[in-house]
Amino acid sequence: RLTFSEALTQARAIGAALLARGLSAERPAMVLSDNSIDHALLMLGAMHVGVPVAPVSPAYSLMSKDCAKVKGIAALLKPSLVYAADGAKFAGVLGAVDFGDAEIVLGANAPAGMKSTPFGELLQQQAGAEVDRAFAAVGPDTIAKFLFTSGSTGEPKGVINTQRMLCSNQQAVTQLWPFLGEKPPVILDWLPWNHTFGANHNFNIVLANGGTLYIDDGKPVPGLIEKTVANLREVSPTIYFNVPRGFDALIPFLEKDDGLRKSFFRDLQLIFYAAAALPQNLWEKLEDLSIRERGKRTVMVSSWGATETAPMVTSVHFEIDRAGVIGLPAPGTEVKMVPNE
């Protein structure tokens, strides 16, 4: 558990540690592992002092025999610091990829013989005037992140995300969803921070609105969806974000578990899907479950965006009665329609 005050104190310490090590837009921080509190602190600490952070899909490290995508990203970024939560889990990629002179920072389980720095050491750095100066220098065009596209059409491509992009997205969200200012959001989310949906949209909604984020250690796959179910029994979100396959995996549990269904819908203001089309039958099942539990439909909406737009381009900010609607251009956004040739 981490409060906003504690997060700021620790982010400043990490920011000081990164400045002392000379990190910059030319030599950023690179993250190999999944969502975690330490991952969030590194991300916040880096952005606090104007150092870009590049979260990389853990699958590139753990599901690949040759770690080719990580090699390509490392060669492009030339990171000055590489973080992994578990040194044993990521030992393969740490040994296979040439990270140059980058400092390897590990949360736990440092492999024998590998030179590395414990993550806790970053938190020991004293934050002084240099952090204040660096923070004051952060502006709209400061690079916040390098996010990498999924690589579905080739090698992952690096996308620059500036503070202007992140902040304008959140300004648009608050204009479209004014209820966020009335009640701080409570979100349980598994969506990865190496992807724009989980990081720039969901994480930043919590950050911008003083909300509470519970990191879901489950995923919509057999053997891990059960963790999400267990977490939803304990946490009643006010907004629930997921991709269509996530809802497909969750719905059978909601249908048969009265306690889970009660917890899920107790405080729910909004159901949000994105990243793919939601089949109409799943939409109807979610509607039926909501009516069964609370006697009325829960508002369901969607959005359309891209890594390059950090991420929102269009948004549904009105009630709809079917899936497949991507909404209207978000405030500050223009969309040009071109013929499909």
Model-predicted segments: where are they?
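Conserved structural elements of the adenylate-forming
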Residues: L8-I14, Q125-A129, P140, V159-L180, ...
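Conserved ATP-dependent adenylate/AMP-binding module captured primarily in the ANL superfamily
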Residues: Y60-G95, G128, N169-L188, V221-T238
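Conserved AMP-binding/adenylation subdomain of ANL enzymes
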Residues: C167-V186, T196-F241, R245-K262, E334
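Gly/Ser/Thr-rich phosphate-binding loop
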Residues: E121, N209-G211, V229, T238-F241, ...
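Structural core segment of the AMP-binding/adenylate-forming
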Residues: R21, H48-E121
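Conserved AMP-binding A3 loop
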Residues: L2-E6, F135-A136, A144-Q171, V316-H317
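Conserved AMP-binding/adenylate-forming core of the ANL superfamily
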Residues: R1-L44, S61-K71, P118-A127, N161-Q163
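Conserved pre-ATP/AMP-binding loop-to-beta segment of ANL
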Residues: V105-G107, P111-F148, E155, F179-V186
